[in-house]
């Protein structure tokens, strides 16, 4: 099985797992009913420093981060950080713009121990759910089909904060979310192992 097929299988498992753990059905709510959403501003790559307050630039979410992270690869000085949107532990950072539909709403869950900051073209989702569960859900076909109704643009695709808040998401009980995350994490670990093996074979 190819790595991409494995990833798609893992994401498709969310619906199966919800059906398994919630046989009587699962409550679905607009994202805005379970979270507060905030639009970022400012922050350019030229603002990065070697140390300071951790930051995640929206462009890095496409290329440098996966489903979740507890460390940032970039920093800004405190003076600038004070002007930027704060990201609390357990928040999601979601891309608001991209050149293609697939990358709009790409999410990374912030699992670090302290606040960081983000900037323009990012939406912070503050909630009381399992952050990794929500971040995984943002990768599903179900979410993709729902977001299409709200993404607009041609050369540059964009979603507004208030429209992202309208997207309906499944909200199983927290213990179910945790079990789903445990299973999907195991898929991700297997995917990482396969990628490492493939790289080793190519270098051999």
What are the functions of these language-model segments?
Residues 17-41, 204:
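Non-catalytic DNA-recognition/assembly elements of restriction-modification systems
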Residues 1-11, 25-27, 165-203:
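Amphipathic alpha-helical segments
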Residues 20, 42-43, 80-81, 111, ...:
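Short, solvent-exposed loop/turn positions at domain surfaces
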